[in-house]
């Protein structure tokens, strides 16, 4: 009797086991899905960042008269970046979305900023300022900053690459509040404030 019961138990147990092989998951497919998710996140981040950066730039110029004299600087009003600028965790995806390479590119600019009023557009690449070439790669932004006089109003000659066309612009710097803006995208409740050092959109 024990033999029959034991045999029956083994038979039932064996019948309960999977009778086919488990599916083999493709690592190529999962890597592709991960890349798609990362790209979607980066695009979502940009869709939030760019409008707020445009708004922030306009506010800094429009509110210049409200800032103390010591809290004003001269600027052209362009938010610039290249392939080394984005957060490392989404850098590859940001570079893909914006077409960023070693050259310094206009990511956004305000409508009332000097560059915006002069006709410069997001996507333009900065090649030269006053006949001096802008460095490429990791030193691109510092190369640009060194050529901008923060203390005095000045007319600049800019050489821009737009698509495959090189265009010359003249842009006169204007005063803006010296502090910059920070965009915190981890907060689900919108808020905006300035503390004298930075302006925060969250």
Where does each model-flagged region fall?
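Sec-dependent N-terminal signal peptides
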Residues: 3-12
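Bacterial Sec signal peptide processing site at the extreme N-terminus
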Residues: 15-35
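Acidic/histidine-rich, surface-exposed loop or edge segments in extracytoplasmic proteins
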Residues: 28-43, 196-199
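PDZ/PDZ-like peptide-tail recognition elements
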Residues: 46-104, 170-187
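Sec/Tat-exported extracytoplasmic proteins
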Residues: 56-67, 119, 130, 148-149, ...
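Conserved PDZ fold ligand-binding element
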Residues: 115-140
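PDZ-domain C-terminal substructure recognizer with occasional recognition of PDZ-binding tails
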Residues: 142-182
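Polar-ligand-bearing catalytic/cofactor-coordination segments
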Residues: 180-202
């Amino acid at each position: 009797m024990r033999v029959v019961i034991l045999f029956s138990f083994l038979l039932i147990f064996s019948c309960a086991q999977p009778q086919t092989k488990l599916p083999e998951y493709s690592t190529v497919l999962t890597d592709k899905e991960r890349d798609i998710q990362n790209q979607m996140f980066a695009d979502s981040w940009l869709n939030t960042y760019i409008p707020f950066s445009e708004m922030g730039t306009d506010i800094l110029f429009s509110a210049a008269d409200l800032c103390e004299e010591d809290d004003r600087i001269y600027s052209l009003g362009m938010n610039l970046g290249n392939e080394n600028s984005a957060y490392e965790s989404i850098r590859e995806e940001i570079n893909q979305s914006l077409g960023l390479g070693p050259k310094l590119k206009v990511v956004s600019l305000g409508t009332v900023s000097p560059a915006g009023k002069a006709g410069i557009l997001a996507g333009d690449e900065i090649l030269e300022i006053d006949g001096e070439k802008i460095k490429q790669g990791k030193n691109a932004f510092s190369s640009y900053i060194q050529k901008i006089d923060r203390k005095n109003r000045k007319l600049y000659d800019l050489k821009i690459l737009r698509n495959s066309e090189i265009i010359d612009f003249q842009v006169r710097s204007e005063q803006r509040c010296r502090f910059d803006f920070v965009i915190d995208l981890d907060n689900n409740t919108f808020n905006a404030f300035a503390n004298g050092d930075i302006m925060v959109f969250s």
